């Protein structure tokens, strides 16, 4: 029974458990000294709290309350009941949200009704029904979608342009309702995979699955809201006894759940990151003006046209298929045009089509007659400013001061500078595009303050090799390890940054592997040193952990396998990376691992191996191996220890030794303390980490040996 403390100290019964209505109005009037109006209130049947709290001036005048002072006292007291009710409702809502925000991972697993099994995801269909799908062993979006498509009822399958049912994964989309922004969010592949394999993402029990030509129906949205409210209801029953796991749900109101939803589309004039990750090339190709805001439109159009023609010529000459993962703008435009042609060809009369085309194959643009390709090129010609435009060398100028590094891959002679996609102490990283081929790139750019600093070429490379080795050894002694490094001047810092970039160039141009970021070349231009690297859509392991939290173990094994394959390739080339960590492991939107940042990497010579020379204290402290901290040896086994630390990162969402400072971590590692192995890892996972954290580097397994570990065996259903 609820009570309200009066000014005189008397408690009034205002709850629903009142046994008599008259005492309430009587006590109400006695409290404010207006009992002379009691008979009037009773005659008008204004005797309960619900009736009294809606009193106003006109009603009081009709009741005969003519004194202004009495009316004010009655109105103030009656309005306080409404205020108390609102405060009570707000307090209840606050208590609910506090319970939600205080939940931990353990509390989520308590509610088996929401996610019955560990590896299960609930997909909502457009008829309002829901399907539970086991995604264990599915490491990409295609495999997840295929499992669901096999179980779809016939009436919910997508149809192609001919009205035929299709089960191709590219014909289906996945949405999720974002109640913090009150929008429908279309998931990209990397988002779908991450949500499905995350333990703490409550969205995994209400993903909406529709065909590409549809948007989520009212029935699907209604089912999603019911599951969402059921989730909140279940979470509210758990006491505030654990950590702040679901703080992102704070601030969600009832109005958000009931308001009108909009689809979260990208705006044409706004550069968008996908969950704080680099956007895919397909998206950039549809918004070039947005991603290259300071580039002349004529130059952009010319590049698009030349890239398209270049891709079309290569397709015909080499009969090469169009790669779905290409970062080349011409390939993307060609693929889009090809899709349109396929749709048009399928719409032709079948009898007419059979007399001209092989009915067993749908011809692709790459295999069409030359005149067909010319026709499409002419269509793209409409994008150009003038069909009689000057040649590339005239357009970009003949007196360019770019000096290119000779590499196995042609260095871009002309390139378009796009939006900034990252920055650091060395400078900035920009989105770039080869002006001739249309290839998208990530361009590391650092200002060269000293005019004597130049890009090394093959002409002076051999002559300066001994000097460079000596400089490298001097640089190793004062390399950055957090608080350990104390450079004397800003000029020394800048010089070291440039040296690190030049060192990175020399190593990268020898590397050509799927799991290593591709190096396109370097140039010195306008006082800047540019390094042209492969553009990797997506983000690093570190950024994904920050956005999504720890990974599922099946996803960790998939990424670890690829990291070790890349590390094994480096070691075969006698290169030690020396800075393997989550921030230097990129994951593209297809789930492919790319190792990057070779600024402090080292190429071992046979002399290095024989002498087993004293190691320098280089790298990132929390990922350092004991022999590096003790400076006892320089071996490839340091990368194995660091890879184990990355596995710890993916398991926990934090670096090893998260409770220690850098100096404390150096002391711990130096006294043979290994990182704590997650207790929730499988027995094989724990065994893998124990081998990676072998204190004696001579007994620590190599990358090739670890690749044969049972933990990395793929168990794909």
Swiss-Prot record:
It is an enzyme of class 2 (transferase). Coiled coil: none annotated. Residues 415-712 form the Protein kinase domain. The modification Phosphoserine is found at residues 323, 465. Keywords: ATP-binding, Kinase, Nucleotide-binding, Pheromone response, Phosphoprotein, Serine/threonine-protein kinase, Transferase. ATP binds at residues 421-429, 444. PANTHER family: MITOGEN-ACTIVATED PROTEIN KINASE KINASE KINASE 19-RELATED (PTHR11584:SF369), SERINE/THREONINE PROTEIN KINASE (PTHR11584). Serine/threonine protein kinase required for cell-type-specific transcription and signal transduction in yeast. It is thought that it phosphorylates the STE7 protein kinase which itself, phosphorylates the FUS3 and or KSS1 kinases. Homodimer. Interacts (via SAM domain) with STE50 (via SAM domain). This is Serine/threonine-protein kinase STE11. It comes from Saccharomyces cerevisiae (strain YJM789).
